[in-house]
Amino acid sequence: REAEDTGTITIAGGSVNIAVTGTATKGLKADGDVIVSDGDITVTTAGGGKWDEEDAKTKASTCISADGKVQIDGGTLSLTSTGSGGKGISCDDELVINNGDITVVTSGGMYAYVNGREYTNYTGNTDYLDSDQKSSPKGIKSDGNVTINGGNIKVTTIGNGAEGIESKAVLTINDGTIVVNSCDDAINSSSHMYIKGGDITVVATDNDGLDSNGNMYISGGVIRAFGTSSPECGIDANEEEGYSVIFTGGTLLAVGGGNSTPRTSESTQPYVSGSMSVSAGNEITLKSGDTILATFTVPDNYSSSNQGGGPGGWGAPANAGPGGGGPGGGGGGWGGSSVLISCAGLTSGSSYTMTSGTSSSTV
C-alpha cells in the first residue's frame, strides 16, 4: 500500500494485514512519514532484490518503507521479509520507537549486482562493491538517527550480511526490551552509540554484538552482548579511528573473540575482563568474596563454536577502573571467549571471581 496526497501513512488502530509477492515489493510505502500509534499490523513480503537501471542501484523488498521518518508509538507489529536483501523497516530519515510490540524476521541472503549479473544469495567478497551494488538483509534500518525510548522489540535476521538494527547516524537506546539475533552485527551505528537504559540481549553468529563506528557510551540499562570468534567482539567501538567504549553506569556482559578496551580516563564505572569457556545456558557470575555483583544467563541460541580468539593483547589490566590501564585491545585468550563485565559495586584495583558454568577464574 502506498501513501497518497500528503505522502504520510498514519495508523491509529484497527487491523492491517498485507502480503505482497514480487521483486523489490513494499508492504507499506510512504513518500513522507509512517506514523503508528496503535493497531494490529501484519506485513509479509516475499520476493528478492533487483537492479534498477534508471537509478543505478539495488532495491529490495521491505515491509515498511518511508522516504521520511518512521515513528512507532504503540500497537503490535509483525513484519516478515523472505526475499534476498529484504528488510523489516527502512527509512531515509530518523526512526523513533516510543512503545509497541514489534517482531521482525528477515530470512533472505544478500542481493548483489556484480559485473552485470544479479546474485540473490551472494556470499562473495563485497569490499570492492559500491553500496548501491548490494542490499543486505536488515531487521530495522534508518539512514538517519535511531532512537528507542521503549517497547518490546524482537529482531531475527538470517543470511549473509544480515544485521539486526542499524543506524547510518547516531543510535540511542533510552529504554525498552530488545532482543536481536543476527548473522552480521546485531546492533550497528555509523556514528556514536548511546545506551542509557533498557533490557538488551543481542547475539551475532558471524560478527559483533554491539558495533559502533564512533564512541560507545554506556550509562544505564542491562546489556548482554554476544559476538563471534576473533576478531569479532561482544562490544566493538572503532578503535582504529581513536574511538572507544565509555562506561558511566549500567550492567554489561560482553562475550566474543575480543572486546574493545574501555577508555578508562573518561569512564567512571570500572570493568573486569578475562578469558574463559562460555556455552549456551551457562550462568556467568561475578562475585566479590561471597557477594554476587552480577549474574547473567547465556542465551540458548549462543553457540560455543563462536568462542575462540587469539592471544590476549590486554591493553589494560583485567580489573581496570577509572584511570587504570593504557591503550590496547581486549582480545580473547586461547581456548576461550573474551568476557567483559561492568556493573555497580566494582572498585578499581580489587580482585573478583568470575564463573561460567563449572569454570572459574580470578580477575
What are these regions (language model features)?
Residues 1-363:
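A composition-driven surface/loop motif
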